[in-house]
């Protein structure tokens, strides 16, 4: 598994439906980039200029919404993950 550093977070991307309600299969070019996922790993937090470590506000297991083009996409063991900074997360969904 990936271990993020600092204020970085590893997100498991939530897949969207590939067909419409009417049964039409969407080609790859018609799909929107996902903006939600599940937190699977968090870093230790950012360090301030005074040397104080500030813990992250999100936790493993949180369902989050993030900026559309944020982070770096990686594949590990066939699973898609996104590594992004805490500041790229817009909200935690309940």
Curated annotation (Swiss-Prot):
- Keywords annotated in UniProt: Chaperone, Cytoplasm
What GO molecular function terms would the record report? ATP binding; metal ion binding; protein folding chaperone; protein-folding chaperone binding; unfolded protein binding
Q: Does the keyword DNA damage apply?
A: no
Q: Which domain of life is it from?
A: Bacteria
The Gene Ontology CC terms held by the record are: cytoplasm
Which GO biological-process labels does this protein carry?
A: chaperone cofactor-dependent protein refolding
- A Pfam family this chain is assigned to: Cpn10
- Between which residues do disulfide bridges form? none
Q: Where located?
A: Cytoplasm
UniProt family annotation: Belongs to the GroES chaperonin family.
Listed NCBIfam families: PRK00364.2-2, PRK00364.2-4, PRK00364.2-5
Description of how the protein assembles with itself and partners: Heptamer of 7 subunits arranged in a ring. Interacts with the chaperonin GroEL.
Q: What does this protein do?
A: Together with the chaperonin GroEL, plays an essential role in assisting protein folding. The GroEL-GroES system forms a nano-cage that allows encapsulation of the non-native substrate proteins and provides a physical environment optimized to promote and accelerate protein folding. GroES binds to the apical surface of the GroEL ring, thereby capping the opening of the GroEL channel.
Return the PANTHER family for the record. Answer: 10 KDA HEAT SHOCK PROTEIN, CO-CHAPERONIN GROES
Put simply, this protein is called Co-chaperonin GroES
This chain is encoded by the gene named groES
């Amino acid at each position: 598994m990936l271990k993020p550093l600092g204020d970085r977070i590893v997100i498991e991307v939530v897949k969207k439906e590939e067909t419409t309600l009417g049964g039409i299969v969407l080609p790859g070019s018609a799909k929107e980039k996902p903006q939600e996922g599940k937190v699977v790993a968090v870093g230790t937090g950012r360090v301030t200029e005074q040397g104080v470590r500030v813990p992250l506000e999100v936790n493993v297991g949180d369902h989050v919404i993030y900026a559309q083009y944020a982070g770096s996409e990686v594949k590990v063991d066939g699973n898609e993950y996104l590594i992004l900074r805490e500041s790229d997360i817009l909200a935690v969904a309940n």
